[in-house]
């Protein structure tokens, strides 16, 4: 976080909590946090002017059930969870909802040349979509694709989301590359994906917001046709891009 933020704990949950009055003054009523699951910060890390720049975007998840340790201001073991809970409580006290950006389309283990520290070791064939010759389908653009509609993986995702709702009191989720959550084990799009249906009708998740980034890196684009059961909202990427180009004046769209 840039020093101009003026916060005591930049780049942390506590640092964001310091800016809540500013958000309140803007009239903000909901905050969407980029991925806060524990993720691989060293992927794509680089040295620039002798400064080590880490990957802080969060889109290389390592553990779906744990908040990222580096977002703790104290850097003490197990403090990150308490600090995130404190942030969410303060946002709620100021009448702001909290949406988590969640990444269930892939993990930081990458393809067959990537590291092995979780699902590859548990059961590679269950947790990942594999081609007939044992390579990884890459509908995520990140090396592997989580096999979301296998019963084991589906239950893990449901348990994870319930955990974040019950334990952290989050108000909703934005699903990165959500179209992957509707593919079967060989990547074929399903008409009624078991995972998406289960999410739509789950008793614990019934009152939380479900927001789909309704496309993936495999070319599947489902804006306007995402399986929703009247429960899912959708990001409209093309509208977003058109509005950005218009506001910037690209291609003379503002003339």
Predicted feature descriptions by range:
Residues 169, 182-186, 190-255:
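Conserved alpha/beta catalytic core and glycan-binding cleft of carbohydrate-active enzymes
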Residues 1-170, 174-201, 220:
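Substrate-binding/active-site clefts of carbohydrate-active enzymes
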């Amino acid at each position: 976080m840039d020093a101009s933020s003026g916060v005591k704990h930049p780049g942390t949950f506590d640092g964001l909590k310091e800016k809540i009055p500013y958000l309140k003054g803007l009239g903000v009523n909901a905050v969407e946090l980029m991925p806060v699951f524990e993720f691989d910060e060293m992927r794509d890390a680089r040295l620039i002017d002798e400064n080590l720049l880490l990957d802080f975007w969060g889109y290389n998840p390592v553990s779906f059930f744990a908040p990222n340790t580096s977002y703790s201001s104290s850097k003490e073991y197990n403090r990150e969870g308490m600090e995130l809970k404190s942030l969410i409580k303060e946002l709620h006290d100021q009448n702001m909802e909290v949406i988590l950006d969640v990444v269930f389309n892939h993990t930081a283990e990458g393809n067959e040349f990537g590291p092995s520290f979780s699902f590859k070791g548990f059961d590679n064939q269950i947790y990942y979509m594999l081609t007939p010759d044992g390579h990884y389908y890459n509908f995520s653009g990140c090396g592997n694709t989580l096999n979301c509609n296998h019963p084991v993986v589906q239950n893990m995702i449901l348990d994870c989301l319930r955990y974040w709702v019950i334990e952290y009191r989050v108000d909703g989720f934005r699903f990165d590359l959500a179209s992957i959550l509707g593919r079967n084990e060989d990547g074929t799009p399903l008409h009624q994906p078991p995972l998406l249906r289960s999410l739509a009708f789950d008793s614990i998740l019934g009152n939380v917001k479900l927001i789909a980034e309704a496309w993936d890196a495999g070319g599947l684009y489902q804006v306007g046709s995402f399986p929703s059961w009247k429960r899912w909202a959708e990001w409209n990427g093309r509208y977003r891009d058109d509005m950005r180009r218009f506001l910037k004046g690209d291609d003379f769209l503002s003339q």
